[in-house]
Every structure is written in C-alpha cells, then in structure tokens.
Amino acid sequence: MAKDDVIEIDGNVVEALPNATFKVELDNKHVILCHIAGKMRMHYIKIMPGDRVKVELTPYSLDKGRITYRYK
C-alpha cells in the first residue's frame, strides 16, 4: 500500500543511531535521518553502516525518511 506522493531515492548508510535510526547520505550528498520500515523490522532485515539502501521521503519533510529496501 504505497503512497503516490513519496520521493524514492538511493543512498548509503553512514551511521547507526539508537532506536533503529540511521544517518543516510543520499546520492545528492545530503545527509538525512531515516528509520526502518515496518515490513523490514518484521522480517528482521539488518542494516549496517556502508549498506546501499532505498529511502522514501515525503514532500512535506525532506530531512527525515524511511528505509524501504536494502540492496544486496
């Protein structure tokens, strides 16, 4: 059930923070805070610094995002 108005962009995880929050450097060199999507938590997908991830941003808040996919 994805929303139509989200912005999807790729990035690299820079730092792991408490409470499943991560600093992610996007391809355009901006660094944002991201949390893990619920489906990724449910399936115990681990995110480590250095991983390449797909991030969803809303047009309302471009400094926070949600990690929806970890590339292999």
From Swiss-Prot:
**InterPro entries the UniProt entry points to:** NA-bd_OB-fold, RNA-binding_domain_S1_IF1, TIF_IF1
Pfam families hit by this protein = eIF-1a (PF01176)
Family as reported in the entry's similarity comment: Belongs to the IF-1 family.
- State what protein this is by name: Translation initiation factor IF-1
Q: Which NCBIfam families match?
A: infA (TIGR00008)
| MF terms in GO | ribosome binding; rRNA binding; translation initiation factor activity
- Read off the HAMAP family from this record: IF_1
Q: How does it assemble?
A: Component of the 30S ribosomal translation pre-initiation complex which assembles on the 30S ribosome in the order IF-2 and IF-3, IF-1 and N-formylmethionyl-tRNA(fMet); mRNA recruitment can occur at any time during PIC assembly.
Keyword entries, A-Z: Cytoplasm, Initiation factor, Protein biosynthesis, RNA-binding, rRNA-binding
Extract one GO cellular component term from the record: cytosol
Q: State the function annotated in the UniProt record.
A: One of the essential components for the initiation of protein synthesis. Stabilizes the binding of IF-2 and IF-3 on the 30S subunit to which N-formylmethionyl-tRNA(fMet) subsequently binds. Helps modulate mRNA selection, yielding the 30S pre-initiation complex (PIC). Upon addition of the 50S ribosomal subunit IF-1, IF-2 and IF-3 are released leaving the mature 70S translation initiation complex.
Can you give the residue ranges of the S1-like domain? 1-72
The protein's location, in the record's own words, is: Cytoplasm
